[in-house]
Amino acid sequence: MLEYLLLLISTVLVNNFVLVKFLGLCPFMGVSKKIEPAVGMGLATTFVLTLTSAFAYLVQHYLLVPLAAESLSTLAFILVIAVVVQFTEMVIHKSAPDLYRILGIYLPLITTNCIVLGLALLNITMQHNFMQSVVYGFGGGLGFMLVLILFASLRERLAAADVPAPFQGIAIGMVTAGLMSLAFLGFTGLIKL
């Protein structure tokens, strides 16, 4: 049990996919202007990452490995991701139409978000078992949601600040993301797995 907790904390803080591995930067910059869509996108991505991790593990170990078709893992994972994202989109559309409208094009774009495919491939590379894969996916989603909400709150404050003209817009966003990345590097060495 402690192993799973350490893996979760490590994935959220120490090895954050956005700020340390630089995966998922498109939605990180695109959906982080306001906190509400950031929370919705974070929850949707966490849901997708957790389910994708579970299904990618099952496809890899119970379909591809027995058929000696490991070379098709990337293609198989893309199909798994597409199905999970479509399912997530239907659930959000039925249960939270306002969130569905706010997320707009970013919801189906989770399919092409490199964090989702990267996580599935990293699970296989790191040889995680089923529970480790699910925890790694959940932790990756929580880490993504954490930095997305933090970044959105900072961008809301920056929108009200007196930022010099050359730094307005995306420039101050990149500087802020860089400073956040440096702050998260402070967690390095916190957990040794």
Curated annotation (Swiss-Prot):
Keyword NAD: no
One GO location term (cellular component): plasma membrane
InterPro entries documented for this protein: Ion_transpt_RnfA/RsxA, NqrDE/RnfAE, NqrDE/RnfAE_oxidrdctase
Keyword vocabulary terms for this entry: Cell inner membrane, Cell membrane, Electron transport, Membrane, Translocase, Transmembrane, Transmembrane helix, Transport
EC number(s) recorded for this UniProt protein: 7.-.-.-
Subcellular location: Cell inner membrane
Transmembrane annotation, as ranges: 5-25, 39-59, 72-92, 102-122, 134-154, 170-190
Listed GO biological process terms: electron transport chain
Membrane topology: Multi-pass membrane protein
Keyword Mitochondrion listed: no
Family named by the database record: Belongs to the NqrDE/RnfAE family.
Functional note: Part of a membrane-bound complex that couples electron transfer with translocation of ions across the membrane.
Description of how the protein assembles with itself and partners: The complex is composed of six subunits: RnfA, RnfB, RnfC, RnfD, RnfE and RnfG.
Protein name: Ion-translocating oxidoreductase complex subunit A
Gene name, Swiss-Prot/TrEMBL: rnfA
